[in-house]
Amino acid sequence: MVTDEDTDTTKVVEQPPVKPPVEYSAWMQLRPRIARELLDLATAGSLPTGAALKRVCRRLFGPDCSPHDETRFLIFAAPIARKIAIGLADRGDRIGDSDVKVQDLVEWLGWLDRFDPMCATMIDLHYFAGLTAKQTAAALRLSPEVVIRDLRFAKAWLQTKLI
């Protein structure tokens, strides 16, 4: 006899928590799952990106995920969240109330990824993972003043490129 317990689809969909990886190659193996779960949450539109990242982290590593492991997860997953958020936006759309188009942001972030990856990581953590400047500084083991300075520089640089 088949019971509801035997046909429960959540057992198939949900995967048990995994141990946060140490090796970069192990993180890369998790990348498709992280991207899929972030995309599902983004298309549902129910959560800000930072909250979605934290939810995926808890799904992956369980409720007992340490702050250290969550930080490592955010450093790895924030660029994925950025690409998904920008990918879902219309290239002609503007960012907030500004004159900045999504396409301009895509080009600028691509440049930043190549020429100042640390600043790009700061932007990912601050704007896409929702961390404060202090939290971003702690995650990257930098002083808050350095993070604030670099975020201000990035914003000013973007404004000069778009004038």
Model-derived features with residue positions:
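Intrinsic, short, N-terminal disordered tails of RNA polymerase sigma-factor systems
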Residues: 1-163
